[in-house]
């Protein structure tokens, strides 16, 4: 079958109502426009795709050697979404209430939390077309894209992909090894990756449009309706799909602060506090406490002074200070800053009060009287006059809803009696003072993320649930709030998504929500950060997230111009109705959650009125660009997705306004300027043309997904029945698998019964299709010899050579002969970020170039000696230094490094062997220059022995240095926690300096 026939058959199957062979059974909706764009080009068509997904996979544990054979339950998706994950839903699935718990099962299954980015397989007409599309994909950020199949008589297939995936074991169905808070961190990281994945996808769409690719026009109203490529459109209410309808296309820039004085890493914090000194001769931000900081990340008790205008960061020298903590609050009262509560460690929740004298820089502990103030952290505070108001927080597992007032004049606590519209218990919320009121937004109540807004009147000591017009902010916690003139701002928070990449502003004069989008520079995570006002600038310090398998991420200090932000939010507010009155919602709780409960509405118009209707929707910011325009009633009508604001305004049975009389069609559609009509007149125009408001059918028509394992089981069951073979063979189906390049690797225990050999061809074909694999292999154990050879068996495919790209580096190796270390990604990236421009590096265990290539390609080392004794790894290493164009700076030394390694030449030595590299520590000391250098010592260490391992490394290397005649001082400067190697066994790397 030639290319055109295969393309026609594939496109016909895509448009068919029959489910396809993907786990879902149909195309992922977010990338349908992208797939249509590719398929519309005469040289390409897509064969498989995934827009990106977050999932929790339940997979049975390996069978024990017990003689009683238990039937495998099979693996399944406990949770899967192609959108940003809902942390509350994930937690409810993993930590069900007692009433929802299921009965224990005989054989527990492992649970793995995953994120997998976009991947698209595309068949190309010829090799030239393939090379062009691969280059385009790489330029858009899909750097791991490549040609997976070509040659004489073969179809030319490429894969568009990137490697921002994550996979974290979280326990099993009997016991989870993680906490709900840690699951939230995982979800936040995955959502961040999902957002990055979608931005790359949008960028790829724009790149296609800029290079001659066009969308099919089957759903287009006119040539201007290419909604996926509207990034270049100058209509202020139209954007590239990442922004909200009716919000500005322009982005508010974040200005990174250039820090001098103390290292900027001291501001790499979260859970800290910040207050401003805004005087005529002094405009600074005081930062205290938090987690992170310079060197080893830990809870801090440093007091820092930042001058944002010049970037000067100073450490306040103090005789005494509060203990190290995070999750506390800091409030300014006159010339004093009061720090209250926080968490010193998991078992030590604080309720102490400390005061910092701004003029002298001296701390003093305050002994308070009055009502008891229970310990708490993650609470919120606001100061009005001489009093500090505290609400909520967390004490161990208890979330509190109490309100306490500290009178700083007599240091007396008072608890406020609960009455009226009292907020529910919560933590990780935010609160600010405005006049004689304090305003509180969001938080987490233990079950739900909140988006309610309360005000507290300090005179009547009463709470009020506020009702505000405009687009309500998304629910969040661990965010920040600030007050600027007559505006309250909200920034950052969890869940991390594009919704938290906007600055939400509450106009208190008009009681109206507004928002502007922020131009994030480096995936800033404003989670548990601080927001401080100095003049017209918003200073955001710190914030970040942590994942034990992937390290920590902190945000750089930035500055945002609020004059520009407020002005832009006012300019881009969608027009408000002039004479359409909306009935007030009597139920405040219903109103505040309207965004989460609203239906996905569309407006249906006859095709002949579609262009006119689209212009109205665009002009008034009512067109929802996050959803797709589609045809209805056999193409006679066009359905436009509309915003929630429009859905509230538009009522088909509402009488036409008196200011607009029914007119003839020509008068309505010709010569009419949309700039000259009001909001209500525009609504009436739509009604005149027969506009109907419908639920988005395309949005709701979702099919039940089937996992690859389900597909495989069904296909193999059918084969066994046809061949008359016993169904007990299904016990040997793989419950999990890995991917090496385009090879899918199933476990060594799969398909081991000799009976399988009689139906190999049918079985391997079915497995390959169900797993979307071009090549299929069965894992063998890594040989426990010095070369750690792989025994991978290729089941489908010609050979085991694969290409893998990560951190911009290409690794090529024969998977049947060489093992590949997936878990060292963060360490490879760390080595690549070392300053090695003028250094000579010796890698004593080079392998295929795991660390050699980062040193050469990213760290720009002057020269690297690569020692390796596995001939298969050396073959791959030679290929890799050539493929990455660094062969002239790499000397490969084959053989035992104790014999081949150079002596007295290295500024840096890498010892990347686990479980222990101690056998080559003498060689490493000998390789260093006479004046010393740095050693990166790898090892597997029991978690309870980490500190003693560091001491052992220091002492042993010191003894070796003395024995070699080196009078060096040997110190461990840092211990990097790379990953968990096994339960309670950590892969560590000690950075050791010898001088």
Swiss-Prot record:
Instruction: Write the record's keywords in alphabetical order, separated by commas.
Output: Kelch repeat, Methyltransferase, Multifunctional enzyme, Repeat, S-adenosyl-L-methionine, Transferase, tRNA processing
Source organism of this protein record: Arabidopsis thaliana
What is the protein's name according to its record? tRNA wybutosine-synthesizing protein 2/3/4
At the top of the EC hierarchy, this enzyme's class is transferase
Domain of life according to the entry: Eukaryota
Q: Where are the Kelch repeats?
A: 284-335, 336-386, 387-436, 437-486, 488-535
Catalytic reaction(s) noted: 4-demethyl-7-[(3S)-3-amino-3-carboxypropyl]wyosine(37) in tRNA(Phe) + S-adenosyl-L-methionine = 7-[(3S)-3-amino-3-carboxypropyl]wyosine(37) in tRNA(Phe) + S-adenosyl-L-homocysteine + H(+); 4-demethylwyosine(37) in tRNA(Phe) + S-adenosyl-L-methionine = 4-demethyl-7-[(3S)-3-amino-3-carboxypropyl]wyosine(37) in tRNA(Phe) + S-methyl-5'-thioadenosine + H(+)
Give its E.C. classification number.
Answer: 2.1.1.282, 2.5.1.114
Classification of source organism: Eukaryota, Viridiplantae, Streptophyta, Embryophyta, Tracheophyta
PROSITE patterns per record? SAM_MT_TRM5_TYW2
Family, according to the entry, reads as follows: In the C-terminal section; belongs to the class I-like SAM-binding methyltransferase superfamily. TRM5/TYW2 family.
């Amino acid at each position: 079958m030639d290319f055109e026939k295969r393309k026609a058959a594939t496109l016909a199957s895509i448009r068919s109502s029959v489910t396809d062979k993907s786990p879902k059974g149909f195309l992922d909706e977010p990338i349908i426009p992208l797939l249509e764009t590719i398929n519309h080009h005469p040289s390409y068509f897509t064969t498989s795709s995934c827009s990106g997904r977050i999932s929790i996979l339940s997979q049975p544990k390996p069978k024990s050697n017990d003689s009683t054979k238990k039937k495998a339950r099979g693996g399944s998706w406990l949770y899967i979404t192609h959108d940003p994950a809902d942390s509350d839903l994930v937690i409810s699935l993993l930590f069900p209430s007692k009433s929802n718990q299921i009965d224990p099962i005989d054989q527990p299954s492992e649970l793995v939390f995953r994120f997998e980015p976009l991947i698209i397989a595309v068949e190309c007409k010829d090799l030239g077309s393939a090379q062009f599309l691969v280059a385009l994909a790489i330029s858009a950020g899909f750097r791991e894209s490549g040609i997976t199949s070509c040659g004489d008589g073969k179809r030319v297939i490429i894969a568009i992909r990137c490697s921002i995936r994550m996979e974290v074991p979280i326990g099993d169905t009997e016991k989870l090894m993680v906490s709900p808070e840690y699951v939230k961190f995982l979800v936040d990281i995955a959502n961040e990756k999902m957002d990055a994945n979608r931005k790359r996808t949008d960028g790829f769409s724009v790149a296609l449009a800029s290079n001659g690719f066009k969308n099919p026009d089957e759903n287009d109203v006119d040539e201007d309706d290419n909604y996926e490529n509207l990034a270049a459109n100058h209509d202020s209410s139209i954007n590239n799909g990442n922004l909200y309808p009716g919000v500005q296309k322009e982005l508010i820039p974040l200005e990174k602060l250039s820090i001098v004085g103390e290292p900027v890493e001291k501001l790499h914090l979260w859970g800290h506090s910040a207050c401003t000194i805004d005087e005529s001769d002094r405009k600074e931000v005081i930062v205290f406490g938090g987690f992170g900081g310079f060197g080893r990340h830990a809870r801090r008790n440093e007091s820092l002074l930042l001058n944002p205008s010049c970037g000067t960061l100073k450490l306040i020298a103090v005789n005494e200070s509060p203990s190290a903590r995070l999750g506390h609050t800091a409030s300014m009262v006159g010339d004093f800053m009061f720090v209250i509560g926080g968490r010193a460690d998991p078992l030590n929740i604080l309720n102490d009060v400390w005061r910092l004298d701004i003029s002298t820089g001296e701390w003093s502990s305050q002994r308070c009287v009055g009502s008891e103030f229970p310990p708490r952290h993650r609470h919120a505070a606001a100061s009005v006059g001489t009093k500090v108001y505290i609400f909520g927080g967390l004490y161990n597992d208890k979330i509190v809803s109490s309100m306490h007032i500290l009178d700083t004049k007599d240091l007396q606590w008072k608890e406020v009696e609960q009455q009226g519209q009292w907020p529910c218990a919560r933590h990780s919320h935010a609160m600010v003072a405005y006049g004689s009121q304090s305003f509180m937004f969001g938080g987490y109540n233990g079950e739900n993320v909140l988006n309610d807004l309360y005000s507290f009147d300090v005179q009547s000591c009463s709470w009020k649930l506020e009702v505000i017009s405009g687009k309500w902010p998304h629910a969040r916690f661990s965010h920040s709030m600030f007050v600027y003139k007559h505006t309250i701002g909200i920034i950052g928070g969890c869940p991390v998504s594009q919704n938290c990449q906007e600055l939400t502003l509450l106009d208190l004069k008009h009681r109206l929500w507004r928002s502007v989008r922020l131009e994030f520079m480096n995936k800033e995570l404003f989670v548990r950060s601080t927001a401080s006002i100095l003049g017209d600038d918003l200073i955001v310090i710190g914030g970040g997230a942590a994942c034990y398998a992937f390290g920590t991420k902190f945000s750089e200090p930035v500055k945002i111009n609020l004059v520009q932000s407020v002005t832009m939010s006012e300019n881009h507010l969608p027009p408000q109705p002039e004479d359409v009155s909306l009935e007030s919602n009597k139920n405040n709780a219903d109103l505040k959650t309207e965004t989460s409960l609203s239906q996905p509405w569309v407006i249906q118009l006859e095709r002949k009125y579609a262009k006119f209707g689209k212009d109205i929707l665009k002009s008034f910011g009512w067109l929802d660009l996050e959803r797709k325009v589609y045809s209805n009633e056999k193409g006679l009508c066009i359905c436009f997705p509309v915003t929630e604001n429009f859905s509230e305004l538009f009522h088909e049975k509402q009488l036409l306004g008196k200011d607009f009389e029914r007119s003839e069609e020509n008068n309505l559609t010709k010569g009419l300027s949309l700039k000259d009509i009001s909001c209500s007149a525009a609504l009436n125009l739509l009604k005149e043309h027969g506009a109907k408001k419908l639920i988005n059918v395309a949005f709701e028509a979702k099919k039940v997904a089937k996992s690859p394992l389900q597909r495989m089981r069904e296909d193999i069951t059918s084969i066994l029945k046809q061949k008359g073979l016993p169904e007990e063979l299904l016990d040997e189906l793989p419950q999990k698998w890995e991917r090496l390049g385009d090879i899918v690797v199933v476990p060594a225990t799969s398909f081991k019964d000799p009976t399988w050999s009689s139906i190999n061809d049918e079985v391997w074909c079915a497995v390959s299709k169900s797993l979307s694999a071009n090549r299929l292999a069965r894992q063998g154990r890594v040989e426990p010899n010095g070369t750690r050879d792989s025994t991978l068996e290729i089941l489908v495919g010609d050979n085991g050579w694969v290409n893998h790209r990560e951190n911009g580096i290409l690794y090529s190796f024969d998977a049947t002969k060489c093992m590949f270390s997936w878990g060292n990604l963060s360490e490879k990236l760390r080595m690549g970020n070392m300053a090695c421009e003028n250094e000579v590096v010796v890698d004593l265990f080079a392998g295929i170039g795991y660390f050699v290539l980062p040193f050469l390609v990213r760290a720009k080392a002057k020269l690297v000696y690569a020692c390796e004794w596995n001939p298969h790894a050396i073959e791959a290493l030679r290929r890799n230094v050539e493929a990455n164009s660094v062969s002239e700076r790499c000397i490969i030394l084959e053989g035992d490094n104790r014999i081949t390694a150079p002596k007295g030449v290295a500024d840096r030595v890498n010892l990347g062997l686990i479980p222990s590299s101690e056998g080559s520590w003498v060689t490493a000391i000998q390789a260093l220059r006479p004046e010393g250098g740095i050693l990166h010592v790898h090892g597997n260490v029991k978690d309870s022995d980490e500190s003693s391992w560091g001491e052992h490394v220091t002492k042993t290397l010191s003894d070796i240095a003395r024995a070699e005649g080196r009078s060096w001082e040997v110190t461990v400067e840092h211990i990097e926690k790379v990953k968990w190697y096994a339960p309670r066994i950590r892969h560590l790397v000690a950075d050791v300096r010898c001088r």
